[in-house]
C-alpha cells in the first residue's frame, strides 16, 4: 500500500514509500531509510509530503525529466534525506505525512547548548557541548551554523546563536550567553 502514486510513463511511477498494511502508521521503515539511494526497479520513491505535492500540483500528462547522473543531479540538486530510527515507537510513520495523527508532527529539530562562564584569558571550547538533532533524533551537529562575536581577552557578556535546518525543513535556533569575568 502506498498513500500517493503518480504514473511517469508505463510502469514507472513516483510514489510514497510503501506501507505493510493499508494504515499510515505501518511504513516500511527500512525502505524509507533507502530514500536517496537506488532501491527500486525503476520507480521513484518519495516522502509522503513530496509524493502528495506531485499528486496535488501536477496534472496528468505533465512532462517529467529524470536526472540519472550522479555528477549532475539536476537544477534542484539531490535532496538531503532523514533517517527513521529502527525500532522507535513512531518509526511506522513517515515524518513528512501531514496527517494530524502523525506523532512526528510533535517533534522538531533541536539544539542543545548551555551558557558558558569563564575568566579573562581562560579560553573554553564554545562548541564542545553543542549538539543539533533532526526531527527523528539523529545527530546533525555537522550541519549547524553559528554567528556571534566573543573574545576571552575582555570581560563582558557575549552571545552566540546556533541554527540548524534538518532534511525535512524543521528549523532550530538556540542562543547562548558567554560571560567573561575578571580574574579573582
Predicted regions and their residues:
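Exported/periplasmic cell-wall-interacting domains
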Residues: 1-107
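Residue-level "contact hotspot" at macromolecular interaction interfaces
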Residues: 57, 117, 151-152
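Well-ordered beta-strand positions in beta-sheet-rich domains
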Residues: 63, 115, 173-177
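Solvent-exposed, low-complexity, repeat-rich "mucin-like" stalks and linkers
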Residues: 106-138
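Serine/threonine-rich, repeat-prone extracellular segments and beta-strand-based repeat modules
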Residues: 138-180
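Low-complexity, Pro/Ser/Thr- and charge-rich linker/hinge segments at domain boundaries
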Residues: 183-184
